[in-house]
Amino acid sequence: MAITKSKQQKTRKKVKRVVSDGIVHIHASFNNTIVTFTDRQGNALCWATSGGSGFRGSRKSTPYAAQVATERAAAVAKEYGMKSVAVFVHGPGPGRESTIRELITQDFKIVEITDVTGIPHNGCKPPIKRRV
């Protein structure tokens, strides 16, 4: 009898809140691009990656893969009612510019664009450039 009661637990429907303005964090590395939509306090609403969008291997690090990832995350962010965003770009990857272009085509009002890429004060030795 106790087993059937535990299986019939009440599940509450998740209420989506309305967020009119937020922040887009773009982490563009050489291998992948991660796009995260947050509210003003930094609570994540939705995210997408180029690897999770169906791209694998070297195609994952292309600007088109970053564009598709932004398109997927923007569709979910519009369900929250987001209209204006501040963009924080982190990293030197190829998906930096195409992600911002896709945000413009998705009709988001971009309030500010900030580059928050870390600059080493003579920290780790950078990887050696490939000679192909």
Swiss-Prot record:
GO biological process, one term: translation
Keywords assigned by UniProt, alphabetized: Ribonucleoprotein, Ribosomal protein, RNA-binding, rRNA-binding
Any single GO CC term annotated in Swiss-Prot or TrEMBL for this entry: ribonucleoprotein complex
InterPro entries documented for this protein: Ribosomal_uS11 (IPR001971), Ribosomal_uS11_bac-type (IPR019981), Ribosomal_uS11_sf (IPR036967)
Coiled coil: none
Family: Belongs to the universal ribosomal protein uS11 family.
Subunit structure: Part of the 30S ribosomal subunit. Interacts with proteins S7 and S18. Binds to IF-3.
Organism encoding this protein: Legionella pneumophila (strain Corby)
Listed Pfam families: Ribosomal_S11
Domain of life: Bacteria
Function of the protein: Located on the platform of the 30S subunit, it bridges several disparate RNA helices of the 16S rRNA. Forms part of the Shine-Dalgarno cleft in the 70S ribosome.
GO terms for MF: rRNA binding; structural constituent of ribosome
Designated name of the protein: Small ribosomal subunit protein uS11
